[in-house]
Swiss-Prot record:
InterPro entries: HCF244-like (IPR044256), NAD(P)-bd_dom_sf (IPR036291), NmrA-like (IPR008030)
Organism: Trieres chinensis (Marine centric diatom)
Single annotated GO MF: oxidoreductase activity
Localization terms from the record: Plastid, Chloroplast
Annotated EC: 1.-.-.-
UniProt keyword list: Chloroplast, Oxidoreductase, Photosynthesis, Photosystem II, Plastid
Gene3D superfamilies, per database record: NAD(P)-binding Rossmann-like Domain (3.40.50.720)
Name of this protein: Photosystem II assembly factor Ycf39
């Protein structure tokens, strides 16, 4: 089976590429910058030039392709290119995939998209979901919450560097997941007919509130965090005020994203059925506390190695 992966240089996309190559798939990555994507070539993937903002570059990328996995997304602040890439480009991608007789299209969307159609990126993701459903391509849509990898920058690093952490005062559980595990589901969907033409809300086994993640980081780092709480109603008010001005639209959209993860999702009821459908055992899924523990262990080892090298350099200077 030959795969075309969109967004292969991203946090999730690179995991999909690596696991697909390990499993023996023929992997082709649509890229704009060959230099930036060179590590994918070193892994064994084929690189082909393609740009979602230039629809004419898409059809050649699909020649001989069995399945497409789209893990790409624009930054919500890039409004100039948002419609061009995440709507026009992805519509062109679906049409080209249909013309190329692609057998399966896997699309990574976001949780709660239908509840936040006032946010351009969410509106476009929901629109692409709908377009896939209306096409004749067998599809699988994964609605994702957050990645473990994003929590490192949001929580772990500020705790280690004694920087303030901004959180809302809402205690909403978010079922974060490791991108390596999400990649497993993406690839497994290609082998399971029962996952075709379905939309899955994909999350970890446990929901986490901000305070729990901060406490975990404090325990592992051995130091207290600086936490600044911002009421969600104030965040909404600021978002609405900025939204009145064209120059403030980017700020408004970024603030509005805080609301998305503050919609309660009870993954515990559906996780068992989801894992059963994809034939995934609980033990295969990395837990957040284990992920953070491994990160802190690696970091502390690196710091010890750096400290040892500095001591050796000082000794050499003395000698």
């Amino acid at each position: 089976m030959s795969l075309l992966i969109i967004g292969g240089t991203g946090t999730l996309g690179r995991q999909v590429v690596l696991q697909a190559l390990t499993k023996g798939y023929q992997v082709r990555c649509l890229v704009r910058n060959f230099r930036k994507a060179n590590f994918l070539k070193e892994w064994g993937a084929e690189l082909i030039y393609g740009d979602l903002s230039r629809p004419e570059t898409i059809p050649p990328c699909l020649q001989g392709i069995t399945a497409v996995i789209d893990t790409s997304t624009s930054r919500p602040s890039d409004l100039d290119t948002l419609k061009q890439v995440d709507w026009d480009g992805k519509c062109a991608l679906i049409e080209a995939a249909q013309a190329a007789n692609v057998k399966h299209f896997v699309f990574c969307s976001s949780q709660n998209v239908e509840q936040f159609l006032n946010i351009p990126l969410m509106e476009m993701k929901f629109g692409i979901e709908t377009k896939l459903q209306q096409s004749n391509i067998p599809y699988t849509v994964f609605r994702l919450a957050g990645f473990y990898q994003g929590l490192i920058e949001q929580y772990a690093i500020p705790v280690l560097e004694n920087l303030p952490i901004l959180v809302t005062n809402e205690n909403t559980c978010v079922s974060y997941m490791d991108t390596q595990d999400i990649a497993k589901f993406c690839l497994r969907s290609l082998q399971l007919p029962e996952t075709k033409n379905r939309t899955f809300v994909l999350g970890g086994q446990k929901g986490w509130v901000s305070s729990e993640i901060i406490n975990l980081c404090e325990q592992l780092a051995g130091q207290s965090a600086k936490v600044n709480k911002i009421p969600l109603f104030l965040l909404k008010l600021v978002s609405q005020i900025f939204g009145f001005f064209e120059w403030g639209q980017n700020i408004s959209d970024r603030l509005a994203f805080a609301e998305i993860l503050n919609v309660e999702n009870d993954f515990s009821k559906s996780t068992f059925d989801l894992y059963k459908t994809f034939k995934v055992d609980d033990s295969e899924i990395t837990q957040l506390d284990d992920y953070f523990l491994e990160y802190f262990i690696r970091l502390l080892k690196r710091l010890r190695d750096i400290n040892f090298e500095d001591i050796q350099k000082q000794k050499n200077l003395i000698i």
